């Protein structure tokens, strides 16, 4: 019997794959407005600092294909066909939905490579996918809104944190800073669950890994005049050092799933500048990337979503 094909729509932010794509990528983020020469030079310098371009494009491909491979090892009657849809660079989300339609895919499950729900990220990805499917008459897409409580995801971070804590001279002198991408403060007025989901993730992981001292921070805020969620991780580091005198800071950007510009530059370069300035130790566990433990956790998320549909 031929296996039923189901589309696996993996959505992510996207990143420039080469230097020539930096300007059009940021122009898309800015809704068609080109960045100034000064802003563009700053962006190019950041990419140069992490090796020229971000490894995110490669990692996202590995995550999408790896997730499909894990799912297909588990399934007997279904074959998942991966489609990558990106927010700010090709293949765009709409391209992926169109390709599924062209390939004869009638049913798909979508997952965003971000564990926490927010109106700015996950909701906007799912909305774009659904609107395109409605426009072209299919496929039927079953969306996933968040997966930060998935046991395998939490277990992955628990193990990473425990391994990294072994490097600290004293657990009492260590502070773990859990972080995610900052968003405009106005999401709080809209009752967006994003900040609370980060807090919940931090509490769960601190409990699982027996972390005695931890705080919540925000990072990588946009360059706009409106207020963004804080405290910023760098300011928080200075404040905690002044008040508590911690000798080691461990940064856990649990809102991200890959080593990209926000981690390799904003954490490994900018936060490390702060810890060096304070004369304290900098630690950061390896990110999920395409780690098998992480891919299995995502596979569990997708399988549960599909089961909920089938059993209705």
Swiss-Prot record:
Its EC number is 4.99.1.9. It is found in: Cytoplasm. PROSITE patterns: FERROCHELATASE. InterPro entries: Ferrochelatase (IPR001015), Ferrochelatase_AS (IPR019772), Ferrochelatase_C (IPR033644), Ferrochelatase_N (IPR033659). Pfam families: Ferrochelatase. It catalyses: Fe-coproporphyrin III + 2 H(+) = coproporphyrin III + Fe(2+). It is an enzyme of class 4 (lyase). Fe(2+) binds at residues 181, 262. One of its GO terms (molecular function) is ferrochelatase activity. GO terms for biological process: heme biosynthetic process. It comes from the Bacteria. Pathway: Porphyrin-containing compound metabolism; protoheme biosynthesis. Coiled coil: none annotated. Fe-coproporphyrin III binds at residues 13, 30, 46-47, 54, 125. Its main location: cytoplasm. Keywords: Cytoplasm, Heme biosynthesis, Iron, Lyase, Metal-binding, Porphyrin biosynthesis. Disulfide bonds: none annotated. HAMAP family: Ferrochelatase. Involved in coproporphyrin-dependent heme b biosynthesis. Catalyzes the insertion of ferrous iron into coproporphyrin III to form Fe-coproporphyrin III. Belongs to the ferrochelatase family. This is Coproporphyrin III ferrochelatase. The lineage of its organism: Bacteria, Bacillati, Bacillota, Bacilli, Bacillales. The gene is cpfC.
